[in-house]
Swiss-Prot record:
PANTHER family: FLAGELLAR BIOSYNTHESIS PROTEIN FLHA-RELATED (PTHR30161:SF1), FLAGELLAR EXPORT PROTEIN, MEMBRANE FLHA SUBUNIT-RELATED (PTHR30161). Involved in the export of flagellum proteins. This is Flagellar biosynthesis protein FlhA. InterPro entries: FHIPEP_1, FHIPEP_3, FHIPEP_4, FHIPEP_CS, FlhA, T3SS_FHIPEP. Keywords: Bacterial flagellum biogenesis, Bacterial flagellum protein export, Cell membrane, Membrane, Protein transport, Transmembrane, Transmembrane helix, Transport. NCBIfam families: FlhA (TIGR01398). It comes from Helicobacter pylori (strain J99 / ATCC 700824) (Campylobacter pylori J99). It is found in: Cell membrane. The chain crosses the membrane at residues 28-48, 49-69, 125-145, 213-233, 246-266, 291-311, 313-333. Belongs to the FHIPEP (flagella/HR/invasion proteins export pore) family. Its main location: membrane. GO terms for biological process: bacterial-type flagellum assembly; protein secretion. It is a multi-pass membrane protein. GO terms for cellular component: plasma membrane.
């Protein structure tokens, strides 16, 4: 009997429901009235869940429509829809606020299952974390997405309206010239008018999105404060229970409201930034086409990811996998082309599974394409593929890329001496610092400006500059009698002011006191300084092995004993020395110290490095002597140094200075001021001598502050050398 009544009721109501759906205007009116009813009428929890679900679904639907339309005006109803959806979401905020304040004391489940689920999921037992997550979501929506969307719509509306007269004149010109008829002209004018109306409406509608984001913040505060007061003073809830209950509900309500708001704001930006597209290609296809248009960009991304995968501490597998994937896609695209790649995949699937995946009309018989080139054997194809992959994956350790006008500098047949200069650099680095830098790969790069060059370390640009191959660089070192004419520039290695002068003015420049440098020397000097700057990066495990093998020829016992020490520890000590410009020529002393100390300190690199530095006192003192044979230095006053010693904090075997902002600023200013006085006297580098316990921590602090000061300790000075104190740094901490 009940089934019969249900069938009868359904039979009577379905025609009404059908007419309601067919009458679109009536459906919209009912929807708007329902929004107003939501604001006024209290709703049971299951109805509220239903309405919140509709809100999320609508936002997802809108952003998908925004992605699939060909041009913005295809979604001309979007500004009005934006207003209605915003009103609907604010009505839901009112309804959920009412429910939270009136039913929240009964527990989260009495309000809404969706709100409770979102709240408990995000909070995860920690209300502070939940509040932070919600705050981040609100700030991202308000400050990033909403502000960006609003600005885009404003600018797009302004440009669309400014372009109206020109577009109208273009339509009239086409009509007058007979390129289009009256019907086509009317169609274009209508589309132009629709575009102007759309962007004008979007300019105003975007303000709804921003207002909605601000309103949600205020509503959230009301829910928390109001709910807490209601729970404590009206429902006699404890402070903790009231706070936990209403925090869960408020955060859940905020998330349920903010997620659709964020999606709608994103959809607004997508629609506003869409350009008129080709009808033959949708947005997603065009996006993929443009992202993969240049296979070399995929190669660069993949190579960089593989490089990052070699850095300790980073996720090796993830970076290597994604990097290899990018390189593989780039290789496939460069070899087959995007269309050819898809065609090949389509043919393979068709043959393998008997599927017809072609979208184009075709005959029942498929005629094979006649080969236009000689068929390659599988071995040849495999060899070419391996060579292509090897070429893509190979990263030169040190590379010098030249613009096409600079190629002559490296061509000995044309009188270029750049290669000879580079060989001289390798000898000089080996003599001064004690390691052999790798060969520099010199190649041309047509993508560079003609007179520019780049120096790369492991595929990453570490320096670049510009030289004029037919001119000379004239540098004013402070002894110029009279300035000469030239093209102003910056010397790339040291950043000093200089001039590019013609060869005919070279002798005159020398007479007037300028230092003259030829283009090859400019590049070579820049390369040399960069090698010194990044010297620690050249100490690979292979280089450590080579250093030990050379030392073993004369001192086999110490090298054999050092095999008990991990190669990584030896390498880290060498890198730490080079990082602070300490030569590693005296490998015998370095290795003896490491083998003596390492077992006692469990191979701790920090302690080993400081002990090695103390044993290298003669090397360090000699490295920083002035031309007159004296080590000229600065020191701290007793009070200042004692203050810094008191601020040292130990972190395992390392130490750091624990200074507040004011103390750190005073330290930086005090050291910088005295260092500048030393530099003005023509003395470089600036040496600062401190207590051994303070040296490493202060050196790290100076490096972070980008103050070019060499920090040495008393233990690192050769007592038999000559010294000259240049001043004392007094800091009133």
């Amino acid at each position: 009997m009940a089934n019969e009544r249900s069938k009868l009721a359904f039979k009577k109501t379905f025609p009404v429901f059908k007419r309601f759906l067919q009458s679109k205007d009536l459906a919209l009116v009912v929807f708007v009235i329902a929004i107003l009813a939501i604001i006024i009428v209290p709703l049971p929890p299951f109805v509220l869940d239903f309405l919140l679900t509709i809100s999320i679904a609508l936002s997802v639907l809108i952003i998908l429509i925004g992605l699939y339309i060909d041009k913005p005006t295809d979604f001309s109803a979007f500004p009005t829809l934006l207003l209605i959806v915003t009103l609907y979401r604010l009505a839901l905020n009112v309804a959920t606020t009412r429910m939270i304040l009136t039913q929240g004391y009964k527990g989260p489940s009495a309000v809404s299952d969706i709100i409770t689920a979102f709240g408990e999921f995000s909070v995860s037992g920690n209300y502070v974390i939940g509040a932070i997550i919600f705050s981040i979501l609100v700030l991202v929506n308000l400050l990033v997405v909403t502000n960006g969307s609003t600005r885009v719509t404003e600018v797009r509306a302004r440009f669309a309206l400014d372009a109206m007269p020109g577009k109208q004149m273009a339509i009239d010109a086409d009509l007058n010239s007979g390129l289009i008829d009256d019907k086509e002209a009317k169609k274009r004018r209508a589309a132009l008018s629709q575009e102007a109306d759309f962007y004008g409406a979007m300019d105003g509608a975007s303000k709804f999105v921003k207002g909605d984001a601000i309103a949600s913040i205020i509503i959230t505060l009301i829910n928390i404060i109001g709910g807490f007061l209601v729970g404590v003073f009206q429902r006699d809830m404890s402070l903790s229970f009231s706070a936990s209950t209403f925090t869960i509900l408020t955060i859940g309500d905020g998330l349920v409201g903010q997620i659709p708001a964020l999606i709608i704001a994103t959809a607004t930006g997508i629609v506003a930034t869409r350009t008129t597209q080709n009808e033959e290609e949708d947005f997603a296809s065009k996006l993929i086409t443009q992202l993969t248009n240049k296979s070399k960009t995929l190669v660069i991304v993949g190579a960089n990811l593989l490089l990052f995968a070699t850095i300790p501490g980073l996720p090796t597998f993830s970076l290597a996998f994604v990097g290899t994937l990018f390189l593989f896609i780039a290789w496939l695209i460069s070899r087959e082309g995007k269309d050819g790649l898809l065609t090949k995949l389509e043919n393979y699937l068709s043959q393998k599974f008997g599927l017809d995946l072609s979208e184009k009309p075709h005959s029942s018989k498929i005629k094979p394409h006649a080969p236009t080139t000689k068929t390659k054997t599988p071995e040849e194809i495999k060899r070419e593929e391996e060579q292509a992959i090897d070429e893509v994956l190979k990263i030169e350790f040190l590379e010098l890329a030249l613009g096409y006008q600079l190629i002559s500098l490296a061509d000995m047949k044309q009188g270029g001496d750049l290669l000879e200069r580079i060989r001289g650099i390798r000898k000089k680095i080996a003599s001064d610092y004690g390691f052999l830098m790798p060969q520099i790969r010199i190649r041309d790069n047509l993508q560079l400006p003609p007179t520019h060059y780049e120096i790369k370390l492991k595929g990453i640009v570490i320096g670049e500059g510009m030289v004029m191959p037919d001119k000379f660089l004239a540098m004013n070192t402070g002894f110029v009698n009279r300035e000469i004419e030239g093209i102003p520039t910056k010397e790339p290695a040291f950043g000093m002011d200089a001039l590019w002068i013609d060869a005919k003015n070279k002798e005159e420049a020398i007479i007037q006191g300028y230092t003259i440098i030829d283009p090859s020397t400019v590049i070579a000097t820049h390369t040399s300084e960069l090698v010194k700057k990044y010297a620690e990066d050249f100490i690979t495990k292979d280089e450590v092995k080579s250093l030990l093998e050379r030392l073993a020829k004369d001192y086999p016992t110490i090298v054999e004993e050092s095999k008990k020490i991990p190669t990584g520890a030896i390498r880290s000590v060498l890198q730490a020395l080079l990082h602070e410009k300490i030569p590693i020529k005296d490998m015998l002393t370095i290795l003896e110290t490491i083998t003596d100390i390492a077992p006692l300190v469990q191979n701790d690199v920090n302690i080993l490095t400081e002990q090695v530095r103390a044993r290298l006192s003669r090397v360090i003192t000699n490295a920083f002597k002035s031309e007159d044979g004296r080590l000229k230095f600065l020191t701290f006053s007793t009070d200042s140094e004692q203050f810094l010693l008191n601020k040292l904090r130990e972190n395992g075997t390392s130490k750091s200075l624990l200074l507040n902002v004011g103390e750190l600023q005073k330290l930086i200013e005090g050291v910088s001021e005295e260092a500048m006085k030393v530099l003005q006297k023509g003395i470089a580098p600036v040496i600062l001598i401190v207590e051994p316990n303070l040296r490493k921590a202060l050196s790290n602090q100076m490096e972070q502050a980008r103050i070019d000061v060499v920090v040495l300790s008393h233990a690192e000075l050769d007592p038999n050398s000559n010294f000259e104190a240049l001043g004392t740094i007094h800091i009133n901490f």
